Amino acid sequence: MKIGVFDSGVGGFSVLKSLLKAQLFDEIIYYGDSARVPYGTKDPTTIKQFGLEALDFFKPHKIELLIVACNTASALALEEMQKHSKIPIVGVIGPSILAIKQQVKDKNAPILVLGTKATIQSNAYDNALKQQGYLNVSHLATSLFVPLIEENILEGELLETCMRYYFTPLEILPEVVILGCTHFPLIAHQIEGYFMEHFALSTPPLLIHSGDAIVEYLQQKYALKKNACAFPKVEFHASGDVVWLEKQAKEWLKL
């Protein structure tokens, strides 16, 4: 089975990593709209247009399924993309909510949603969680993480300063943290470490990772089995510098 993975840049590598590990598919076409990253600071109309243009990119590749590996596009463009597509299109928000439903039984557990400004303002996660009965939901736009990750700044003083800026004002310590941008799993270990060190937690918060969640969702939805295929063939494309994108992929995914 040949599928497509669409992201605003390199954040979708976190989803791609989970897909490669699961070996559910034969071939994966990855498209990063790196010339227009970040999506999280742009308006909904623009993001919808970017999503439709991504569909145009994938048409000649004859994929059978498209994964929108971008929370901002999933929140604001997914429905419009589905209207204009003959193949199934899966976003990352629904699978993440399903993962929480399966793993978090306490409806009063404090849940923190991290995301870009556009994702947070869409209320996509807040509304979906409330529909499932989760009552203690807060959110935080952490958009500065995206350019740091795009620049491969995954640790060090600059990232620490950024986390301190965002997390110090928190009044309620979360038991669950939704990494509501596919860039964020690339610094998941650092986020977990920050909470453990600065808030003196005995156990780390549960981190919900879009990549792992979407693998579980695809297995259930399409009756796919892990390791059913050989290691997938991966082809990279970008609206910007594809050589740079491939270099980042080789470093982060160990290809």
Curated annotation (Swiss-Prot):
<comment type="function">
    <text>Provides the (R)-glutamate required for cell wall biosynthesis.</text>
</comment>
<dbReference type="InterPro" id="IPR018187">
    <property type="entry name" value="Asp/Glu_racemase_AS_1"/>
</dbReference>
<feature type="binding site">
    <location>
        <begin position="71"/>
        <end position="72"/>
    </location>
    <ligand>
        <name>substrate</name>
    </ligand>
</feature>
<keyword id="KW-0961">Cell wall biogenesis/degradation</keyword>
<feature type="binding site">
    <location>
        <begin position="39"/>
        <end position="40"/>
    </location>
    <ligand>
        <name>substrate</name>
    </ligand>
</feature>
<dbReference type="InterPro" id="IPR015942">
    <property type="entry name" value="Asp/Glu/hydantoin_racemase"/>
</dbReference>
<feature type="binding site">
    <location>
        <begin position="7"/>
        <end position="8"/>
    </location>
    <ligand>
        <name>substrate</name>
    </ligand>
</feature>
<feature type="active site" description="Proton donor/acceptor">
    <location>
        <position position="70"/>
    </location>
</feature>
<dbReference type="GO" id="GO:0009252">
    <property type="term" value="P:peptidoglycan biosynthetic process"/>
</dbReference>
<protein>
    <recommendedName>
        <fullName>Glutamate racemase</fullName>
        <ecNumber>5.1.1.3</ecNumber>
    </recommendedName>
</protein>
<keyword id="KW-0133">Cell shape</keyword>
<dbReference type="GO" id="GO:0008881">
    <property type="term" value="F:glutamate racemase activity"/>
</dbReference>
<dbReference type="InterPro" id="IPR004391">
    <property type="entry name" value="Glu_race"/>
</dbReference>
<feature type="binding site">
    <location>
        <begin position="182"/>
        <end position="183"/>
    </location>
    <ligand>
        <name>substrate</name>
    </ligand>
</feature>
<dbReference type="InterPro" id="IPR001920">
    <property type="entry name" value="Asp/Glu_race"/>
</dbReference>
<dbReference type="GO" id="GO:0008360">
    <property type="term" value="P:regulation of cell shape"/>
</dbReference>
<dbReference type="GO" id="GO:0071555">
    <property type="term" value="P:cell wall organization"/>
</dbReference>
<dbReference type="Pfam" id="PF01177">
    <property type="entry name" value="Asp_Glu_race"/>
</dbReference>
<comment type="similarity">
    <text>Belongs to the aspartate/glutamate racemases family.</text>
</comment>
<feature type="active site" description="Proton donor/acceptor">
    <location>
        <position position="181"/>
    </location>
</feature>
<keyword id="KW-0573">Peptidoglycan synthesis</keyword>
<comment type="pathway">
    <text>Cell wall biogenesis; peptidoglycan biosynthesis.</text>
</comment>
<keyword id="KW-0413">Isomerase</keyword>
<dbReference type="InterPro" id="IPR033134">
    <property type="entry name" value="Asp/Glu_racemase_AS_2"/>
</dbReference>
